[in-house]
Amino acid sequence: MLLVGSGAKFVQQLEQAGALAIYVTPEGGSEGHYLRRLRGAGYEVVTLSSKGIGDLASYLTRIHGVRPATLGKSERRTYFFPALIEQYRATLPPKAKGLVFWFYEGHVFSQQELSYLVKLSREDKGVKFVVELGRERSIRWQPLQSA
């Protein structure tokens, strides 16, 4: 059985760093413990897949277009969605500490995209990022700028 700590150190380091790189176990399940700890600390957590996002800056901070797959003879359309950060910030409860975006499959991000997440977390103190960068035998994390 995997022995998991209280998660208080994880929340504290996320608040200090703003963005964390996390390495989870291959069998999974342990990250749910840390998600619950973040929610218990007053954060609203949004889990997203890193694959298929496209331009990360547009996706998080600007109105961006999304084109669904064309199936045969249907016409090509573009739908426009608001910035993801503003969309979730509008629905935050009044007592929430902020938003945490948890990206799984984060190994597909380039180094430039990871540094953008660090920069964005420093500019906007109400937004934090956790990126799953790989697998290890036991769960560990470190600040994203040193990953």
Swiss-Prot record:
GO cellular component: plasma membrane-derived thylakoid membrane
Reactions catalysed: a plastoquinone + NADH + (n+1) H(+)(in) = a plastoquinol + NAD(+) + n H(+)(out); a plastoquinone + NADPH + (n+1) H(+)(in) = a plastoquinol + NADP(+) + n H(+)(out)
Key words, A-Z: Membrane, NAD, NADP, Plastoquinone, Quinone, Thylakoid, Translocase, Transport
GO molecular function terms noted in the UniProt entry: oxidoreductase activity, acting on NAD(P)H, quinone or similar compound as acceptor; quinone binding
Membrane topology listed for this record: Peripheral membrane protein
Record's subcellular location: Cellular thylakoid membrane
Entry EC no(s): 7.1.1.-
InterPro entries: NAD(P)H-quinone_OxRdtase_su_N
Protein family per UniProt: Belongs to the complex I NdhN subunit family.
SUBUNIT field: NDH-1 can be composed of about 15 different subunits; different subcomplexes with different compositions have been identified which probably have different functions.
HAMAP family tied to this protein: NDH1_NDH1N
Its biological purpose: NDH-1 shuttles electrons from an unknown electron donor, via FMN and iron-sulfur (Fe-S) centers, to quinones in the respiratory and/or the photosynthetic chain. The immediate electron acceptor for the enzyme in this species is believed to be plastoquinone. Couples the redox reaction to proton translocation, and thus conserves the redox energy in a proton gradient. Cyanobacterial NDH-1 also plays a role in inorganic carbon-concentration.
Stored PANTHER family: NAD(P)H-QUINONE OXIDOREDUCTASE SUBUNIT N, CHLOROPLASTIC
Protein name according to UniProt: NAD(P)H-quinone oxidoreductase subunit N
Species this protein is from: Synechococcus sp. (strain JA-2-3B'a(2-13))
Top-level taxonomy: Bacteria, Bacillati, Cyanobacteriota, Cyanophyceae, Synechococcales
